């Protein structure tokens, strides 16, 4: 039996054993509030509240005075929550009286399990094992072009599976092709990110559009659709809004895998509370997922010139740094690539992206993968996409309707084509 087959069967066995029946988390009569701090004292109150109870869920990090924060509150916690806000004179706005009802309004269309190897498409979302089976089928049907790769492991023993694509070989005129690394799904609830990653894989292998063919043939691609498999499985079996890994920390679970990378870890924009959605972990690379994936990427040092991380939502394009407002030394080039990329994303459907450096464009966030890649791996171009929908979508932002998978992915690929063209023109692929 081939290594690829052995790996796949082991993966599916692990997934099957881990997917035991669990009571699905529901949010009936949970309320969602938008709050906004007006001063540092109010911000500290919110920081203390974040991670204080699993009955109060912050959908946004508590980082900046004046920034809107979405908070989901269990029915029995509402009186205490409002009392705390009232005592500190923190302004709030009720956005949903029944979070579950709001979530149910979006039909995400999840594919029937076990059908993916013959009917994988982008009209629906897929569970982890079906996507892994599809990746395996690509390696089998595209020998010499697609290689199954294991980017790392998870706490629950799953593999972080992806593909290496070398269309036309790994060299051009005797020289190694530049490398593009793409990871998605590091935050479990952001389903559109893995879906877009698989769409890109398919387009690289099948598209007859000239600029996409050039993108496939001129670069070596490393694509990992699920950088947080345990968390993604948990969003399907138990809690659709789960974000973190599934490592146990006392009575709470998981660390934020995009605050856990070993570059200015936990300096700003992360929490030290294990119950928080932005928990940085007890130490840098405490999570098996980030540690093992970082080791894989370190093995590619010198081979990757462009690093991409797919997230959702808000329609942002972001570049380093997240730990400081100081700008990269090649910020002028980042701005040129940024301008070309957001112009391209707008052309097909008129979708508007904004962004810039992470710290100033959205919020401080140390320990992110793009910062680590740029800061430690000599990857001079590193970007994070926050995909559809827009930042005003609030609660339903993580539940992009399945009919938007294709347009969201098409405009993303348009942007990546323009990005690669600009990065090449600036000499980073030389």
From Swiss-Prot:
Compartments it resides in: Secreted
Cofactor note: Binds 1 zinc ion per subunit.
CDD domains according to UniProt: M14_CP_A-B_like
Signal peptide interval: 1-22
GO biological process, one term: proteolysis
Keywords: Carboxypeptidase, Disulfide bond, Hydrolase, Metal-binding, Metalloprotease, Protease, Secreted, Signal, Zinc
Sequence similarity: Belongs to the peptidase M14 family.
Protein name (database record): Zinc carboxypeptidase A 1
């Amino acid at each position: 039996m081939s290594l690829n087959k052995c790996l796949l069967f082991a993966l599916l066995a692990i997934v099957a054993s881990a997917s035991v029946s669990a009571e699905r988390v529901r949010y009936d009569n949970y309320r969602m509030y938008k709050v906004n701090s007006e001063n540092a004292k109010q911000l500290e109150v919110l920081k203390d509240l974040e991670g204080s109870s699993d009955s109060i869920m912050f959908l946004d990090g508590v980082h900046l005075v004046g920034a809107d924060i979405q908070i989901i509150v269990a029915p029995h916690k509402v009186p205490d929550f409002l009392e705390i806000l009232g005592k500190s004179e923190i302004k709030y706005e009720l956005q949903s009286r029944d979070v579950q009802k709001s979530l149910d309004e979006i039909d995400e269309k999840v594919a029937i399990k076990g059908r993916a190897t013959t009917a994988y498409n982008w009209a629906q979302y897929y569970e982890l094992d079906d996507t892994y089976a599809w990746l395996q089928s690509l390696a089998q049907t595209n020998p010499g072009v697609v290689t199954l790769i294991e980017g790392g492991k998870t706490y629950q023993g799953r593999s972080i599976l992806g593909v290496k694509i070398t269309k036309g070989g790994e060299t051009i005129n005797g020289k190694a092709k530049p490398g593009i690394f793409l990871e998605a799904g590091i935050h479990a609830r952001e389903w559109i990110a893995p879906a877009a990653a698989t769409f890109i894989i398919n387009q690289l292998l099948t598209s007859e559009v000239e600029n996409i063919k050039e993108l496939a043939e001129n670069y070596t691609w490393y694509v990992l659709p699920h950088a947080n498999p345990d968390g993604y499985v948990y969003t399907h079996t138990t809690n659709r809004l789960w974000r973190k890994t599934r490592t146990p920390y006392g009575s709470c679970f998981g660390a934020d895998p995009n605050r856990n990378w070993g570059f200015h870890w936990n300096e700003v924009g992360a929490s030290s509370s294990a119950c928080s959605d932005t928990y940085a972990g007890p130490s840098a690379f405490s999570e098996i997922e980030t540690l093992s994936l970082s080791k894989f990427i370190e093995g590619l040092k010198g081979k990757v010139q462009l690093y991409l991380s797919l997230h959702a939502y808000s329609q942002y394009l972001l570049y380093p740094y997240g730990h400081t407002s100081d700008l990269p030394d090649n910020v002028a080039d980042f701005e040129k690539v940024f301008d070309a990329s957001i112009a391209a994303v707008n052309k097909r459907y008129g979708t508007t992206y904004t962004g810039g450096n992470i710290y100033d464009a959205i919020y401080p966030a140390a320990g992110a993968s793009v910062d680590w890649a740029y800061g430690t791996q000599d990857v001079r171009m590193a970007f994070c996409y926050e995909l559809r929908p827009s930042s005003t979508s609030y609660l339903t932002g993580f539940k992009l309707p399945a009919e938007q998978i294709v347009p969201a992915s098409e405009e993303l690929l348009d942007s990546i084509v323009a990005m690669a063209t600009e990065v090449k023109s600036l000499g980073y692929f030389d």
